[in-house]
Amino acid sequence: MSSSRPASSSSSRNRQSSQARVLAQTTLDAELNAEYEESGDSFDYSKLVEAQRDGPPVQQGRSEKVIAYLQHIQKGKLIQTFGCLLALDEKSFNVIAFSENAPEMLTTVSHAVPSVDDPPRLGIGTNVRSLFSDQGATALHKALGFADVSLLNPILVQCKTSGKPFYAIVHRATGCLVVDFEPVKPTEFPATAAGALQSYKLAAKAISKIQSLPGGSMEVLCNTVVKEVFDLTGYDRVMAYKFHEDDHGEVFSEITKPGLEPYLGLHYPATDIPQAARLLFMKNKVRMICDCRARSIKVIEAEALPFDISLCGSALRAPHSCHLQYMENMNSIASLVMAVVVNENEEDDEAESEQPAQQQKKKKLWGLLVCHHESPRYVPFPLRYACEFLAQVFAVHVNREFELEKQLREKNILKMQTMLSDMLFREASPLTIVSGTPNIMDLVKCDGAALLYGGKVWRLRNAPTESQIHDIAFWLSDVHRDSTGLSTDSLHDAGYPGAAALGDMICGMAVAKINSKDILFWFRSHTAAEIRWGGAKNDPSDMDDSRRMHPRLSFKAFLEVVKMKSLPWSDYEMDAIHSLQLILRGTLNDASKPKREASLDNQIGDLKLDGLAELQAVTSEMVRLMETATVPILAVDGNGLVNGWNQKAAELTGLRVDDAIGRHILTLVEDSSVPVVQRMLYLALQGKEEKEVRFEVKTHGPKRDDGPVILVVNACASRDLHDHVVGVCFVAQDMTVHKLVMDKFTRVEGDYKAIIHNPNPLIPPIFGADEFGWCSEWNAAMTKLTGWNRDEVLDKMLLGEVFDSSNASCPLKNRDAFVSLCVLINSALAGEETEKAPFGFFDRSGKYIECLLSANRKENEGGLITGVFCFIHVASHELQHALQVQQASEQTSLKRLKAFSYMRHAINNPLSGMLYSRKALKNTDLNEEQMKQIHVGDNCHHQINKILADLDQDSITEKSSCLDLEMAEFLLQDVVVAAVSQVLITCQGKGIRISCNLPERFMKQSVYGDGVRLQQILSDFLFISVKFSPVGGSVEISSKLTKNSIGENLHLIDLELRIKHQGLGVPAELMAQMFEEDNKEQSEEGLSLLVSRNLLRLMNGDVRHLREAGVSTFIITAELASAPTAMGQ
């Protein structure tokens, strides 16, 4: 597939290409199925797949065959033998269709069950309630009355004639209700509760294991879930099967019993799992085949039904003969498959708005959890449901891994783009990003790259020859003349005539045109080179019977499909290439735009003024909020010393503000909370802000006897103007009363109603459910919060009717939120300790409520769990306001960071123009004095580049920052002249005379060190001296140079520079900022002096400031090494 660079967004491009791919693939599936049905024993799977790849494009005339194929898939009239099926009229509950084995299974008389009545007969028109005992019939009738009839699955019923128990599994189909009946085995303990809550206990251990994973590795996640499913179900083989972007599949993770051939690493063509089957997996997320050799059972329908009964939602639906043959060939007699459904586009996560699930983004099938067994195997419905829930939890974590991978990917690409941009700005030539390190191959994954520039070719690793590069460029100019870029996973399919000559090593290509003649290329080899084989049979050329559909034959077919193809280029890779293309065009554009330089100062000035005004307003608001908030707020500096303690914190703890300030935070919390606070403080100082952390604070004075104060805290890193973390602010919520209520509730069973229904505003919103999942409690605070009265929600299913991702009283944001709530509720019912979790739902009026939720088990006197109680905590208006202000502060910091990035990018373009102008001047007839001025300009240019590079430093003002020193030989005269030149215009404006009382020996001294940094330091202190000198004053520079021998031919030079100026001197506040004695916000001058002082300390030097009558002096010291030229003298 090849594509030019479109203007639409990557998500829309992705969606359109996906739809087109699915339509084309469905047609191919239909063709294969038709060939199979017609060919019989002569069916050759491998040849057909290869023929489809090389065949003509899909024609519209085949649509009838596709429709027939889809109808055949969806409307089969056969079921498997592990149960029986009834289809019921929705209004009367009379039978309108039944499987041939249903009468025998449901109405056979058992001699062990005495009966005086005639046994019921099962046929068309039979009322389903007549077949079962009263209790089972009532439960079934109740379930059939729900809008979501599957909500109570499985329903335990007993046959009236035989007394045999069955699981009734209900779902709605077009025009009717379909009920599967699966017998409960004598060895199986039946699930006595309606609904799915009991199934959770079966998967509780596996879910806890997945929940405890740290994240950051998709491979670890998949290996864990595969191992847990293997242990839970007992199948011989369990695999995590992942679909790739082009719909082909891969066994990503696998575990088997000893002796089985592994399939790990096998890739399968997209036709192995047809699109119609994938659609069914999206609707019915668990599929079980008990015995592929068993005879299927027919379904008998009433005559003249106005619709076809669809068995798509039935677990009993029989597999198609093609799939049965595949299973037989691979000796997989039984299988169990769970769908893993994730968000369709992880790139759009940040665009998700607070809307109910039905308005949310679509889902896609990420892959399957596949279980195989070498003998017939039946898994009861409760265990299947547990596996389905486990797959849902797994899908939530897959989504999280997508997000982590996306963040890491963006970070790495951004880092690489920055490094390549820096190289371009320094050299102003694309050759530097090809010949240097890193280079363009580090930007995206590829096997080779090339640059065509000025008619010449530069090649990297596995790239075509120079003549082939020219040939590709000619083809691009001829066929894709109007395109600024191109990406293809197959040059052969894209129509490049020379693709065959390139062979398998050059299949895919991405192109970025700098201009009509200069082009960047990236190349990829064929896909098979990327494929790994997981077992001993690692030679794909081993002979197989091409007529027997088998995993290794599918792998061979896949290799045929991907011949002459590479891995596809993803949207984020093309975005990275496109960004580099824009940078290259801007850097190499000879026609500069004068308006850019003129508008730059205005834009920077506006940003600066707006940013400072906004920051001052935010800071003032933060201070006011902290002092007046009705929630406790405390703050510490980088050493953990308290520098903020509001009145609410003082009121709760009994510790006055004056007594708290200056004390270490760890001395104020309970011993049991010290590790928690230490971790929270450490992470916050690293910029990682934890949320909803609970710890206990000591009480003092009159509050001492009340016990510790329990706080739930959000950590907010305090940052300075340059986004450096300088402390931590803790925005807390007092949970002491909440904890007392919970403790009292769990201890005193008889008092719970008085507590729950107390209208006291201190009582939080509380709701509960019994052990079967029915809502059993809903207090007054919950009614006020949600808008739903107690009698409107009691005796409804808590998970499904009260809370659900759609069609519930309180809709949740999406399916992931529902799964998380299920885990929390079921964990409490299983007796596990649960932590508070973020929770959100839409109230009756459609307003989205964000809160914390804690679930606690309810026990009877005997210690048996009889239900669950949930406590909701909603943040106060003050806390919400404080969080909004914090967000505004973070946005302001982000604005300033973007401004810095913009400045850095925009400044480099005019700097490149200045560099070009100076180089051009050097080639003209200049006298010695003019050449000196050009040399001064070059030195100032190097200084600017050095300062711009410092913007990458995370902590530029800290002594331990990564500011580097480059050792090179330089003349002290060059440093002084360049530094003085930077203040001459200011001196002329104020009438200040600047004099350099420097001896000739000093000026001609050649030394080793970082001359650019020394120049930066000297210019900073000169600027400050000039700024705070009176009009008409003077500034004097003097020096002292001492050599210390440390060997026969090596000397260390102790350099001392004095900058003396007239006037009152530099303000004390500025000096305090330079010497880090002032923790307040730093000014621009203070920051500049602090950075210069840190640089001096890296040079084993420092700065002192002397203030005398009418005169002030900076004394600068540094340690350098003498250069060889000086040693020779």
From Swiss-Prot:
| Region annotation (Disordered) ranges | 1-24
Which residues belong to any copy of the PAS domain?
Answer: 618-688, 748-822
Q: Which domain of life is it from?
A: Eukaryota
| InterPro entries the UniProt entry points to | GAF, GAF-like_dom_sf, HATPase_C_sf, His_kinase_dom, HisK_dim/P_dom, PAS, PAS-like_dom_sf, PAS_2
Subunit-level organization: Homodimer.
Q: What protein family does this chain belong to?
A: Belongs to the phytochrome family.
The name under which this protein is listed is: Phytochrome A type 3
Q: Which organism is it from?
A: Avena sativa (Oat)
